Amino acid sequence: MPKYRSFTTINGKNMAGARALWRATGVKDADFGKPIIAVVNSFTEFVPGHIHLRELGQLVSKEIEKSGGIAKEFNTIAIDDGIAMGHSGMLYSLPSRELIADSIEYMIQAHCVDAMVCISNCDKITPGMLLAALRLNIPSVFVSGGPMESGKILVNEKIIKIDLVDAMMHGANKNTSNKKLLNIEKSACPTCGSCSGMFTANSMNCLTEVLGLSFPGNGSLLATHIDRKNLFLKAGKIIVRNTKNYYENNDSSLLPRSIVTKENLKNAIILDISMGGSSNTVLHLLAMAYEANINFKMIDIDLLSRKVPHLCKISPSSSKYYMEDFHRAGGVFGILSELNKINLLNTSILNILRMSLEKTINKFDILKTKDKKIISFYSSGPGNKKTIYPFSQSFRWKKLDKDRISGCIRSKKYAYSKDGGLAVLTGNLAKNGSIIKTAAITNQSSKIFSGPAKVYESQEDAVYAILNNYIKSGDIIVIRYEGPKGGPGMQEMLYPTTYLKSMGLDKKCALITDGRFSGGTSGISIGHISPEAANKGLIALVYDNDIININIIDRSLKLKISSDEIRKRKEKEENRGIFAYTPKKRLRKISDSLKIYSMFATSADKGAVRNIHKINF
């Protein structure tokens, strides 16, 4: 039977000093012997998805203490990708995932903590906390801050929903007046919470539901709604129960590595493909597999992407549906129910509620349930008032969206496509794979695209070219040396794709990169090209006006040049000596911390994790 980890710091005469310090934090005589549970918060005033989390940590802590534990809260960092985007700040976003995981490990191990509740929300924070949970393998519960309400503006006497991407797009549109832009800017992000579409943050929070590490509704219930409070209260209760079961009853079935198996990672990517989630989720699931030592690779994702139907389109893939609409349609378990009907899921896996996925689907499927509490829960909707406060409104829809023909969630028979919203492309340009969010392609004829390359060695140069009309219809923009190692940091390319959209070129051009894309990206945008340019990938040898062939139907990405020409270009590149496979004209200041990240970073097909085998101990 495992011993409480915290006993290391509280038992025995020689731990008098440690106990004295625990007492100084408020621990009483009667508390010693209770499990010490960390509340890992990510409150910050920099990020709307985290602005409201300050009090929520205390909410969870009080519930832990009521339930028989000692709660101790600490914070991680949290970067807002939207604010960091379009300048050198984005270099720090992906590396922050590792920094978050490491900082949690340091705090948990240094203080011999028994378990943790992770309060996350936005893009790299949820993945960083997931990596930490798998690394530490102690009882863990996830509860996120929840999605933002969609923005609303009045256009021709009709309410139109908008989000952050609309503000970016109109910011680049020369035809948008300053008055109209200001109205959009003030309306796009009306409340606290993670941005209102199926971008990276909400995609990852939805995946924690199917992974079994959070409660139903965690990914879809609005940050502002009163019902969300119960998720935090429940987290405090459940973590104490699960912690005692592990340490006192030797029950390891609900540890992160027991829950997150290869079959469960498959469930997660199946959900992601069917709901057209962010392509960044692929990166994070691969990193989780690495952390848990699970043999889950791009080939597994490729095989699943060919047979999972696309059942849901939410902004940025749709201008009609947002996270508030997704929740009304049953959220994650609404989609899982449809996927289970066609036998795509492994439903025997347990979750933190100690329920199998099968039982959880049956209980929370809005098409089946007669439970008034569950019906009321999924009726939660937007308050449509600007606020930075959680639990500040209690609006409920009079009717749920149970339409599986043309509603927010569809059945297989009425799917948007037979194969899902994400696809893996391979070929000589992406030997180890690349990712495209097919859910974001509205023009089906764009699934086969061929054109001349326009090559740029930084996102900044590509943006300049787009905004100054150097890009023409039919071009394929190549942005290289923006991978995990080459960037370093694998920047998101939301600005280039948004600017293409603002200039009416999003359906007439393609963009390929060894960098990555925001969950808000649309159009023919292929990222995660592996190996990246800095790891001697063929993308480093593409020249202007080379013809590139993209075939999403056949899952291929090819540079149309001969093997002899490739050999000559390799020789020429390698003759650059120590400067081989580095950008030729880029002016970019790289900090020491980013240089360290670059030294160990792997390409996207490995989840952009650090290759620790480069370190000899």
UniProtKB/Swiss-Prot annotation:
Reactions that this protein is recorded to catalyse: (2R)-2,3-dihydroxy-3-methylbutanoate = 3-methyl-2-oxobutanoate + H2O; (2R,3R)-2,3-dihydroxy-3-methylpentanoate = (S)-3-methyl-2-oxopentanoate + H2O
Pathway named in the protein's UniProt entry: Amino-acid biosynthesis; L-isoleucine biosynthesis; L-isoleucine from 2-oxobutanoate: step 3/4; Amino-acid biosynthesis; L-valine biosynthesis; L-valine from pyruvate: step 3/4
Name of the protein: Dihydroxy-acid dehydratase
Reported function: Functions in the biosynthesis of branched-chain amino acids. Catalyzes the dehydration of (2R,3R)-2,3-dihydroxy-3-methylpentanoate (2,3-dihydroxy-3-methylvalerate) into 2-oxo-3-methylpentanoate (2-oxo-3-methylvalerate) and of (2R)-2,3-dihydroxy-3-methylbutanoate (2,3-dihydroxyisovalerate) into 2-oxo-3-methylbutanoate (2-oxoisovalerate), the penultimate precursor to L-isoleucine and L-valine, respectively.
HAMAP family the UniProt entry points to: IlvD (MF_00012)
GO BP annotation list: isoleucine biosynthetic process; L-valine biosynthetic process
Sequence intervals crossing the membrane: none
